[in-house]
Design a protein with these regions (language model features):
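Helix-to-loop junction immediately C-terminal to a conserved catalytic motif
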Residues: 49
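Conserved ABC ATPase "signature" region
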Residues: 64-65, 108, 112-137
């Protein structure tokens, strides 16, 4: 469970990215955060694993107060939270298999992982994660030889190998073509359904958010302006979140 209690975030330049946010995300939910660029979506997402520390309020993950965490307790929190980025964050010159193995780094000493001394169990976990994502045959291919969609699947496999309870996805399909986007979103649905992992994703394309997420969080100018089931989102709701009708490039317009 993730709880925001009167959470605010002000950056050093004075920009108030989050304003008194109160919300609870339950275990196993698939939540999409939507809103204009600069609304505070990424700040909200990255506050959960303290990539962007909050300024005030309280943020709890499984009843642990994230705010004071540092050192080993913070590393343990981040071990339980997978992170997917728009840019994939793979080591391009490494094999797919070794990239996925890095999901196990937090379970071992720096010395062992620096020299690639992963136990057999970790290697099995990495291969199983690749199999789950349907790219086991690419295990020993260099990451930079894969398509964008395949690279994002490797990133998701890396998160699976981490054995997290929560996966945070920051615009995970923004750099993909429409067809590949649908394939990757289906992968997120599979992870959520088959493993019961909580998925919290920032989404640029509203129709994708409504199709795949069961719950929508709308952020506007740092404020929480909507929180409810995706089935309850209508045109009036979107105007409330975006302040206007949606532009064409915010609608993906691709059917599965």
């Amino acid at each position: 469970m993730i709880q925001f209690i009167d959470v605010s975030k002000t950056y050093d330049n004075g920009v108030q990215a989050l304003k008194n946010i109160n919300l609870t995300i339950n275990e196993g939910e698939f939540v999409a955060i939507i809103g204009l660029s600069g609304a505070g979506k990424s700040t909200l997402l990255r506050a959960i694993n303290k990539m962007h520390p909050i300024t005030s309020g309280q943020l709890l993950v499984d009843d642990v107060d994230v705010g004071p965490l540092k050192g080993k307790p913070l590393r343990l929190l981040r071990r339980s939270i997978g992170m997917i980025f728009q840019s994939f964050n793979l080591v391009k010159r490494m094999s797919v298999f070794n990239n996925v193995l890095t999901g196990r780094v937090a379970y071992h000493s720096t010395f062992k992982t620096f020299f690639g001394l992963f136990p057999k169990e970790d290697k099995i976990i990495a291969l199983e994660a690749l199999d789950t994502m349907g790219i086991l045959e690419k295990a020993f291919t260099r990451a930079d030889q894969l398509s964008g969609g395949q690279q994002q699947r490797v990133a998701l496999a890396r998160s699976l190998a981490q054995k997290p309870k929560i996966i945070l996805a920051d615009e995970p399909v923004a750099s993909l073509d429409p067809i590949t986007t649908v394939q990757v979103m289906n992968d997120f649905t599979k992870v959520n359904r088959d493993f019961g992992m909580t998925i919290v994703a920032n989404m640029h394309h509203v129709d994708l958010a409504l199709k795949y997420a069961t719950r929508i969080i709308g952020i506007r100018d740092g404020n929480l302006v909507f929180d409810g089931p995706s089935t309850e989102v209508d045109d009036d709701t979107l105007v409330k979140i975006y302040g206007r009708s949606l532009a064409h490039n915010e609608i993906l317009g691709v059917e599965e």
